[in-house]
Amino acid sequence: AASAVASASKSQPTPAISQFYSVVREETRGLPDRTVYRPADLKAVGPDVPVIVWANGGCRHANVFFATALSLLSARGFIVIADGAPEAVSTLSTAGGAQPQRMTEVIDWVTKSKDAKKQFDGRASGTRIAVIGQSCGGIEALVAGADPRVDSVVSVNSGLFANGALGYGRDRLNELHSPVLFIHGGPEAIEYQNSVENYALVDGPAALVGAVGAGHAGIFYGIRDNTQDGTIAVLEEGVTVLVQWFDYTLNGNSAAKAYFTDPSGLSSVPKWTVETKGLQP
């Protein structure tokens, strides 16, 4: 896939973070057990809408737990295709582990299927595609990210294990060819060490972002510092991180890249940390 980062035009696109579209949640036509989150009026977004493939935590084929975050992400001008049917609540993987091939199946469907072309009125991009996942889904994304059609990879509260747990070792990181974002929930989160060590092992462009106090899934549930009543700010801030990352890596918006590299960006937001290496203009 052509890298939007490498081919960004001199005229920057309208920042994705400043856009907000009504969102439709629907099934995928001709592809079982997936859910589409998309702007209701794709024509208003443009002729080539970036595609984000999502994998859930717990190796589950159910995305309802992440519906709020995925809807808010899609509202910024992205087609998000998540594992699990719209009505699925808690469907475990029948294979008992990570299944990154389910992400590449979605990419195949988007780029080759007549059903997908019809569902998106030919507006789903086949050259601006990202993979992202939470926990087990992050492992799936890191493995699926080796696919040459992938332009951006995000691992949320995850990372490949040194012992190859869930079937994939850290050698897989050598196969990544596009920018990678690792997000963790702070030093006390169970995935923290994995995220930090994976980031260190990646040779290419990458960012390591921490939502201090959010724990293993707080940025999706709006929970920080173990509060039971929720801290909705961390959900909004987490979605902003994702929107800025995809605006940079899929849309080629250098202003979005600055959110990760400039002192006035994410590093100025309370209880967030950021480290980057090799991010291109």
Where are these regions (language model features)?
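Hydrophobic beta-strand anchors of alpha/beta hydrolase catalytic cores
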Residues: 52-54, 80, 208
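Short beta-strand element of the alpha/beta-hydrolase
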Residues: 46-57
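N-terminal cap/lid segment of alpha/beta-hydrolase-fold proteins
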Residues: 4-47
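Short amphipathic alpha-helix adjacent to the substrate-entry channel of hydrolases
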Residues: 63-83
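Alpha/beta-hydrolase-fold serine-hydrolase catalytic core, especially in secreted/extracellular enzymes
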Residues: 213, 223-281
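Gly/Ser-rich "nucleophile elbow"/oxyanion-hole loop immediately N-terminal to the catalytic nucleophile
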Residues: 41-48, 92-139, 255
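Hydrolases whose catalytic domains are alpha/beta-hydrolase-1, hotdog thioesterase
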Residues: 140-144
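The feature captures the conserved acid-bearing segment of alpha/beta-hydrolase catalytic domains
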Residues: 151-219
